[in-house]
């Protein structure tokens, strides 16, 4: 009940945020979001400090959320009207809006439901495979609470890239600027591959150490090291889904999502007996590979201008292997002569620099791309 008023504030703010995004006004978009988060944290800390019970603390946190949503709603409304925004009759836009929004809404809603199903199935299948209840829950906690956040690092950069490229992609598509659209798609795909291929070797070489340093958990580190290669298909799947959604293929990406979700559920059901807790990660990777392949196929099929990305992607993927070997050698060298923390920092810095030089030498990256990525992210 406490959170119900926040639904109104957040719904209206989401519309204004969408308008800011579509009009490429990224600075107010980001500033208002940042202020909302800061208000939520500050008010939450202030209110929780006086709680008398767990239930009272939960209520106070809910009030902090409502307050932060009210702040973002107020700031966005002020900005909207100060910049000349006006209210209009939405009925003429209802049909195209629903046609575009329903598939994406279906994906988001279904994703939450599927995650709920997985959270019920996975422990049961792990226990059936021979784990105790405590071991199963501990393993799930390590994967979902420790390893996956680290493996999601590329998603931050790619999400920022998608945020600023989607309006440009949509504009070029609906104006029929197919040449510029092709260039946008190629640039997005190549930058995504470079980001993933730059991070994978670092996680492979330093994954076990990161698990110890960040969470004091060796199993977390082993999972990061063994599963870091899934970042390439997951990153490409993420950016290609954003590309297709921006040019009117929301129904297709929704269908691909359900195919990938089916693969995830199958892995979650059948694989725990063979690979234990890694079944969840295998399901995520399988879903990403399927979505990635289907998305790329649709992009190639529907593009008026031929999109060239396969050679660049394959060479990027192959380039990961020698850099991983270099990272492992550097890590072993530095760990033998200095404490773990400085060894990890030094290895990571040298490895990222060497990887960047290697990619530039192979002609896979251009200096202007690095500037573009930093500017847009």
PLM regions and their residue ranges:
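Interhelical loop/hinge segments that connect adjacent transmembrane helices in multipass membrane
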Residues: 54, 58-62, 77-109, 176-179, ...
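Helix-loop junctions and terminal segments of transmembrane helices
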Residues: 152-177
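Membrane-interface junctions at transmembrane-helix termini in multi-pass inner-membrane proteins
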Residues: 9-31, 229-259, 274
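Helix-terminus/linker motif at the lipid-water interface of multi-pass membrane proteins
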Residues: 109, 113-154, 171, 211-215, ...
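Membrane-proximal transmembrane or re-entrant/amphipathic helices at the cytosolic face
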Residues: 328-377
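Alpha-helical transmembrane segments of multi-pass membrane proteins
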Residues: 1-13, 205, 215-240, 255, ...
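Alpha-helical transmembrane segments of multi-pass membrane transport and lipid-handling proteins
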Residues: 46, 182-233, 265-266
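Hydrophobic alpha-helical transmembrane segments
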Residues: 31-46, 53-82, 259-263, 277-298, ...
């Amino acid at each position: 009940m406490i959170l119900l008023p926040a639904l109104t504030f957040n719904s209206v703010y989401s519309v204004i945020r969408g308008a800011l995004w579509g009009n490429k006004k990224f600075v107010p978009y980001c500033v208002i979001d940042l202020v909302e988060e800061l208000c939520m944290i500050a008010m939450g800390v202030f209110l929780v400090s006086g709680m008398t019970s767990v239930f009272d603390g939960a209520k106070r946190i809910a009030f902090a959320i409502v307050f932060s949503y009210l702040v973002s709603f107020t700031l966005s409304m002020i900005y909207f009207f100060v910049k000349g925004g006006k209210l209009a009759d939405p009925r003429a836009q209802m049909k195209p809006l629903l046609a575009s929004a329903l598939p994406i809404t279906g994906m988001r809603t279904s994703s939450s439901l599927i995650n709920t199903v997985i959270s019920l199935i996975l422990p049961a299948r792990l226990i059936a495979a021979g784990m105790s209840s405590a071991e199963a829950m501990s393993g799930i906690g390590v994967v979902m609470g420790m390893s996956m956040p680290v493996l999601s690092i590329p998603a931050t950069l790619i999400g920022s890239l998608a945020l600023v490229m989607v309006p440009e992609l949509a504009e070029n598509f609906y104006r029929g600027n197919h040449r510029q659209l092709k260039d946008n798609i190629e640039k997005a795909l190549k930058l995504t591959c470079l980001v993933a291929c730059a991070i994978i070797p670092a996680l492979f070489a330093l994954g076990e150490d990161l698990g110890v340093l960040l969470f004091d958990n060796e199993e977390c580190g082993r999972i990061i090291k063994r599963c870091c290669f899934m970042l390439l298909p997951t990153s490409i799947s993420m950016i290609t889904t954003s590309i297709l959604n921006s040019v009117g293929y929301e129904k297709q990406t929704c269908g691909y999502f359900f195919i990938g979700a089916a693969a995830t559920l199958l892995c979650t059901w059948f694989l725990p007996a063979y690979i234990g807790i890694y079944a969840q990660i295998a399901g995520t990777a399988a879903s990403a590979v399927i979505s990635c392949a289907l998305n790329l196929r649709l992009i190639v099929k529907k593009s008026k201008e031929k999109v060239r990305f396969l050679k660049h992607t394959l060479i990027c993927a192959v380039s990961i292997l020698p850099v991983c070997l270099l990272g492992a050698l550097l890590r072993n060298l530095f760990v033998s002569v200095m404490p773990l923390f400085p060894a990890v920092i030094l290895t990571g810095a040298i490895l990222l620099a060497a990887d960047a030089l290697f990619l530039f030498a192979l002609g896979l990256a251009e200096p202007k791309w690095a500037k573009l990525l930093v500017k847009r992210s």
